[in-house]
């Protein structure tokens, strides 16, 4: 009797699975072939309307578009180069410069702060609960927050 119940339940399981293979994925079952063809036609029309990246756009067309926008683009030669956040204006006599041994550059300070955050024992990147600690449940069993620790 036990083997017949197992056989019957297996046959019922297979019978329900075979006719509706798309039943497990309702997204694919709800999209018909006609809808897929409509999407394909729409995509083809959009690709036809969009210019290819390889085609060169004439400069006259670009200048007309700039005039329509109302603000012509400034040439790149007028833009000063980026100096890494340092001011090009001369410093005052009493102000320390970036090269003083007593004042390290700002980038060195930022790097040291980032390094300290990364090496901190309770770093937020290692916590699955945003730094919170579950004292009762997860501390000893590994079921709560911070159950997976990175090993070095």
UniProtKB/Swiss-Prot annotation:
Residues 50-108 are annotated as: Disordered. Coiled coil: none annotated. Residues 1-24 form the signal peptide. The precursor molecule is proteolytically cleaved by CORIN at Arg-122 to produce the atrial natriuretic peptide. Undergoes further proteolytic cleavage by unknown proteases to give rise to long-acting natriuretic peptide, vessel dilator and kaliuretic peptide. Additional processing gives rise to the auriculin and atriopeptin peptides. In the kidneys, alternative processing by an unknown protease results in the peptide urodilatin. The record marks 122-123, 129-130 as: Cleavage. Residues 146-150 are annotated as: Important for degradation of atrial natriuretic peptide by IDE. Residues 25-122, 92-102 form a propeptide. Disulfide bonds join 129-145. The keyword Secreted applies. GO terms for cellular component: cell projection; cytoplasm; extracellular space; perikaryon. GO terms for molecular function: hormone activity; hormone receptor binding. GO terms for biological process: cGMP biosynthetic process; cGMP-mediated signaling; female pregnancy; negative regulation of systemic arterial blood pressure; neuropeptide signaling pathway; receptor guanylyl cyclase signaling pathway; regulation of blood pressure; vasodilation. The modification Phosphoserine is found at residue 128. Pfam families: ANP. Keywords: Cell projection, Disulfide bond, Hormone, Phosphoprotein, Secreted, Signal, Vasoactive, Vasodilator. Belongs to the natriuretic peptide family. This is Natriuretic peptides A.
């Amino acid at each position: 009797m036990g083997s017949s119940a197992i056989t019957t339940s297996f046959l019922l399981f297979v019978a329900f699975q075979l006719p509706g293979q798309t039943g497990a994925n309702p997204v694919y079952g709800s999209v018909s072939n006609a809808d897929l063809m409509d999407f394909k036609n729409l995509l083809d029309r959009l690709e036809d309307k969009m210019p290819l990246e390889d085609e060169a756009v004439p400069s006259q067309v670009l200048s007309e578009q700039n005039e329509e926008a109302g603000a012509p683009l400034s040439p790149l030669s007028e833009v000063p180069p980026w100096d890494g956040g340092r001011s090009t204006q001369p410093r005052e006599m009493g102000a320390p410069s970036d090269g003083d041994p007593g004042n390290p550059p700002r980038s060195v300070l930022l790097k040291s702060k980032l390094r300290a955050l990364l090496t901190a024992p309770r770093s937020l990147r290692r916590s699955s609960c945003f730094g919170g600690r579950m004292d009762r449940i997860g501390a000893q069993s590994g079921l709560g927050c911070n159950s997976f620790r990175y090993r070095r």
